[in-house]
Structure formats: C-alpha cells, structure tokens
C-alpha cells in the first residue's frame, strides 16, 4: 500500500478507498473482539468504546460495524444502527473539500460491495425523514457524502476551534445544525506538554521542576507559577541557556541530516506543517525573497536569519509540489551566495516526521 497515492484518477481513488476500508475493517474487528473477550454484551458497546472519526477518511467504520453486527452477531438492522450511532463521533478538522470526501457509489461497489446495501439503507432512512437534498447521504449524482454518514449516524460533531465550530454551525453544516443542534460542540485543538516538554526537552523540564516543583506534570495550570519569576534575571538566563543548548542540538541534527551548516545564534523562523495553499508557505517564500533582495542591496539584518521548512504534499497537488520545488531552489541559491549566506539561510528538511518535529518544535 502506498502511503500517499496519487488520487487524481480512478485508480488512485480506488486505492484510497482500499486503504480506508483496510484500516477501518481491521480496527472494527479488533474493537469488537476485545469487547467480547472482556465478557461484555455487544449491545452495551457504547458503554465501553468511543470511536472518534477524524475527518471523513475512517467513515466506513460506521457501515462496517453495522455489517459485522447484523451478519455475524445476530443484531437486527435497527439494533445495529442504534448501537453504532451511540458509539461513533465525528471531528471535522477543516472545511476544505479533501476533508469532506464524496465517493462515487460505483467506486465503493468495486472495492467493498458488501457495504453498499448498508450505505443505501442508511441513505434511504435519511431520505424518508428529510427531503433537503443538502443532507442526503447519496446525492442525485450517485455520490456518497461521507461526512453526512458521520453526522446522521454519530452522536457528536465537533470543530477544532471556536470560530471553526461556529462556521460549521452557521454556514458549512448549517442544514445539519438545524436538525441536530445538540450534536454540535467545540473541542479546541491543543498540544500535550508531556510530549513537547517532558519528552522532548529534558533540560527545560528539569529546570521547571527545580523552580516550581513537579506538580505541573499532572496539572498544566501549575505552569503559571513560572510567571512569579518573570523578573528574576537568574531564571531568565537559565531558560535562555537551555534554549541555546537546544538550538545547538538542532543545528547539529540538521547538519547531520541535511548537510547544511546553520548559525545557532541566528533567529530561527520555522514553518513545519502539511504543505497547502491555505497554510501560506508561499507567502513566507515571498518574504524570504524580499529579505534576499534587501541583503543583496546592502541592507543587512542586525541578527542573522534562518528559515526552516518541513512539509509533505499530496502527489497530485501540483501547486504544492511546485512550492516545495521553489523552496528547494531558493535554498540552493541563498545558501551558496557568499553575499547573503552569512546573514540568511534556508533549509527544507527532508522526510519531515514526528522525530524531526520533536527537534524542531
């Protein structure tokens, strides 16, 4: 299986459906197996399991669970739908089209024909209850709207920021919000300091423990105690030294991985995330070009600048691939220009992943 197939043609779309079904099929079977092994009645599944559907890619877990419960576990269709609807919840991360998948029914029939009768049943139930075309599961063009399955047959729908959730409720998913206002809620995205502090920055974690105690490891709000030391120069100097140590480690890591020598005393401007037009890496690139021209014109920055990018782009996303190419060409020009490189460097890290993120972030 290719991790990121080119889905610009039918073969790529079919492969993506294969991938999605492969994952949810295995996951669904494992979940039900573990619940049964613990001696629980599958009719009580929602009491023991919560399945979070992140964007629409795992949506087929809903009809797959219904299929297993009805064909292998003796459930009626009504019982299976009820249990699954109280087990699955949907998170919408973005309103971009690629996160709201719409698969031709014919494609699903080619890959997982066993799910088609169930999807049609779910669609028919919605169509009998609601006449609005905008909330149908199978539309007039015979496309299956995966997000619509999640919303109709899940117990919760959440966005990942307050403004995002309001957009879902008032605009993008307003037709559903009018039907199921009680399902919509917000869960603001965040980070776990246990990963990005305790695991990735042992020096800073040890210093915090020494300065404010270790209560913050279980209660993040205790990090606010650090504000009591905001005017303590010794504390500020210690944090600065730790930051410099970590920057030096990152410089060494990038030198080893990318072969680029960076200045640890420069300002690090880091943008690491999936490459997409709306993430605006191209805007950052234009700024770097502007700074390059300024330096060439004699306007040197008081502190050297280092720009670090890390990203992946879908194989069929031509513009995103072009932006990566642009950044690579720019890095070659900037880093090899003796007039500019002492004041500015650019590196596009290869194979950006969690291990790299732990160093960069």
PLM regions: where:
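A conserved ligand/cofactor-binding region detector
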Residues: 1-361
């Amino acid at each position: 299986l290719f991790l990121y197939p080119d889905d610009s043609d039918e073969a790529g779309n079919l492969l993506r459906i294969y991938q999605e079904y492969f994952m949810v099929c295995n996951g669904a079977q494992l979940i039900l197996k573990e619940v049964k092994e613990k001696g629980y009645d599958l009719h009580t599944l929602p009491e023991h399991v919560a399945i979070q559907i992140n964007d629409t890619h795992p949506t087929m877990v809903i009809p797959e669970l219904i299929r297993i419960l009805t064909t292998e576990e003796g459930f009626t269709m009504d019982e299976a739908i009820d249990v699954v609807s109280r087990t699955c919840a949907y998170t919408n991360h973005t309103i971009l089209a690629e996160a709201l998948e719409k698969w031709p029914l014919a494609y699903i029939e080619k890959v997982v024909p066993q799910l088609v009768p169930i999807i049609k049943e779910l669609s028919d139930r919605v169509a009998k209850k609601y006449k609005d075309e905008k909330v149908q599961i199978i539309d007039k063009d015979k496309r299956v709207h995966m997000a619509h399955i999640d919303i109709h047959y899940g117990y919760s729908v959440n966005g990942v920021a307050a403004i995002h959730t309001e957009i879902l409720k008032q605009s993008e998913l307003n037709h559903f919000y009018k039907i199921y206002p009680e399902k919509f809620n917000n869960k603001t995205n965040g980070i776990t300091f246990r990963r990005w502090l305790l695991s990735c920055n042992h020096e800073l974690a040890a210093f915090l423990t020494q300065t404010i105690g270790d209560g913050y490891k279980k209660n993040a709000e205790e990090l606010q105690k650090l504000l009591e030391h905001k005017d303590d120069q010794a504390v500020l100097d210690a944090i600065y030294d730790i930051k410099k140590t970590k920057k030096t480690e990152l410089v060494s890591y990038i030198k080893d991985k990318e072969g680029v020598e960076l200045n640890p005393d420069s300002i690090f401007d880091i943008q690491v995330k999936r490459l997409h037009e709306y993430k605006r890496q191209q805007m950052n690139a234009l700024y770097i070009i502007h700074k390059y021209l300024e330096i060439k014109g004699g306007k040197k920055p008081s502190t050297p600048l280092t720009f670090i990018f890390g990203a992946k782009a879908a194989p069929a996303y031509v513009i995103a691939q072009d932006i990566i190419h642009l950044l690579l060409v720019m890095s070659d020009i900037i880093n090899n220009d003796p007039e500019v490189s002492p004041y500015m460097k650019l590196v596009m890290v290869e194979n950006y992943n969690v291990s790299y993120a732990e160093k960069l972030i």
